[in-house]
């Protein structure tokens, strides 16, 4: 039984499609938006319309921005010799928040996942290989998740880049800052031991 009109139910259904929002959270979010109509709903609707009209995918790296090439690709302070490969834009944003890289990026659009039907043709791997052959590029950093699909993708890309004149590196895996050994899984501890560095 519907407790609100079809327009409100539609809003709730659309909000429930967002990651992390189930039906109950979507209902609470809809009520909050309706209560804060002028302070929140109207500016949100305006921001969404701007996103629809102006946001696009960068033709160079796959980032999303209001211009293509994006602000990262056109930033002259970035090191053009380094390309950091990430699975998706959220990973790029995480590295940027951490100020972890001064290089340029390449967004694959996911990782290889045979079980989910995601193959090389579904990702931007060919474009990465082309970029890796550019004379100014000297290092490709594989910043992919330490999952089976991430590892598979990293190995596949490494094999493809054998003929490119670039150094291929990957992020270290191991003990997180502030992490306690007792709480880490065996795979993480093993990786940390194998990739240990001088102190």
Curated annotation (Swiss-Prot):
GO terms for molecular function: DNA binding; zinc ion binding. Residues 81-176 form the Toprim domain. The keyword Aminoacyl-tRNA synthetase does not apply. May play a role in DNA repair. It seems to be involved in an RecBC-independent recombinational process of DNA repair. It may act with RecF and RecO. InterPro entries: DNA_Rcmb_RecR (IPR000093), Rcmb_RecR (IPR023627), Rcmb_RecR_Znf (IPR015967), TOPRIM_dom (IPR006171), TOPRIM_RecR (IPR034137). Keywords: DNA damage, DNA recombination, DNA repair, Metal-binding, Zinc, Zinc-finger. NCBIfam families: recR (TIGR00615). GO terms for biological process: DNA recombination; DNA repair. Belongs to the RecR family. This is Recombination protein RecR. It holds the Pfam family RecR_ZnF. A zinc finger (C4-type) spans 58-73. SMART domains: TOPRIM.
